[in-house]
Amino acid sequence: MDSTAGSDASTPTNHTVSSKKRRGRPPKGSYAAYGSSDDDDEEYSGRTRRRNRNTRPRVSAPSSSSTVVPKDLYSHRATLEDDELNFGVVDPEGEKKVNELGYLNGGREYRCRTFTCLGRGNRLYMLSTEPARAMGYRDSYLLFLKHRSLHKIIVDDSEKWDLIERNIIPHSYKGRAVGIVAARSIFREFGARIIVGGRRIVDDYWEGEFRARGFVEGELADPDDKLPPPGMPYNRNQYVAWHGASAVYHPQPSLEAQLPAAARKRKKEPPKDATWLFQHAKATAAYNNDITKYLVQKQDIGYFEPHTNLLHVPLNTQPTKTHWIQAKTGTECPAPKLDILVALNSDVAPQVSIANIPPSVYASCPLHVQEAIRKRQEQEIRSIRLNSMY
């Protein structure tokens, strides 16, 4: 609608337009309806034409994960027949790939589990959650919301107990609403994407529609699907909730991917021919060093024994006997003095004694260093004598 029409529709005929410009930005709609002068119309005329011009719609390339159905499919009135919504539109080539009960022809296999239901004949059905997860949906609600050609069936108690006895659903589902869907309608909706190793047009139901939209014949419909080696069965349990189906839409990163980039690069690079033995020896020495440090720390702290709820220490680190000397009667003994010696023991390196070092070795050291060495030698000699007495 142009600005003149908007002015006639929104402005009374007896309204007097002021010649004074209004302050502020004009509204996004018609400028004539805003009560502006002719100068205002000329000022914003180019802007109005630029805003209202029609843009060309973008044409996107066909996606391998898109669902293709005839454009006029939903314009027909649907009727419920054999647990399916029948729109009265079929593809002659697609009918050759599946029969009326949902069984596939030509050696094709469904990616999800199929089964028959009690009281519904030999028609094939699927649990609604399994094709939903196979197509990338978190639950069946989104599946039926976005694909209107599918019909959800809620099984009754007798059908539910029959599925439990046949190990199709677990016993914990006895109090829950279980939904199923006809396998034939799933194939009509998703085509090659629901087929094991399905290829476009070759395994699609709406073959003519896929050709018209420019899909490549023979292309894999789902390149991300994990196909088994030749001769091995396809893993249909990956879409079953009680078999870890959450891994389908919650992929976990590998342990190698969680490592830093430098560690991944170092792990991938093979050791050089000239240094591989050195690298192994270096890693082994570091591992042995860690073990030694851990054992020394455990000896200082002790080993916790859960049955006695006590910390146990090695027997060879504890005293085994004591020696008492009785003082003579009538003699006065000086009050004993308590000397506290703080020793810092290294956790890794063993203790080194300097009692047997000759003076010629440290004769060139400063005087205060020589004095410290002599005091340490005297302490060690005194400690050795005390230990030899007991």
From Swiss-Prot:
Ranges of compositional bias, category Low complexity: 57-70
Annotated region (Disordered), positions in chain: 1-72
GO MF annotations in UniProt: chromatin DNA binding
One Pfam family of this chain: CRC_subunit
Keyword Nucleus: yes
Modified residues (Phosphoserine): S36, S37
Keyword line: Chromatin regulator, Nucleus, Phosphoprotein, Transcription, Transcription regulation
GO biological process terms, semicolon-separated: chromatin remodeling; transcription elongation by RNA polymerase II; transcription initiation-coupled chromatin remodeling
Keyword Transcription regulation: yes
Ranges annotated as biased composition (Polar residues): 1-17
Subunit structure: Component of the RSC complex composed of at least arp9, arp42, rsc1, rsc4, rsc7, rsc9, rsc58, sfh1, snf21, ssr1, ssr2, ssr3 and ssr4. The complex probably interacts with histone and histone variant components of centromeric chromatin.
Stated family: Belongs to the RSC7/SWP82 family. RSC7 subfamily.
Name of the protein in question: Chromatin structure-remodeling complex subunit rsc7
Protein's organism: Schizosaccharomyces pombe (strain 972 / ATCC 24843) (Fission yeast)
Gene this chain is encoded by: rsc7
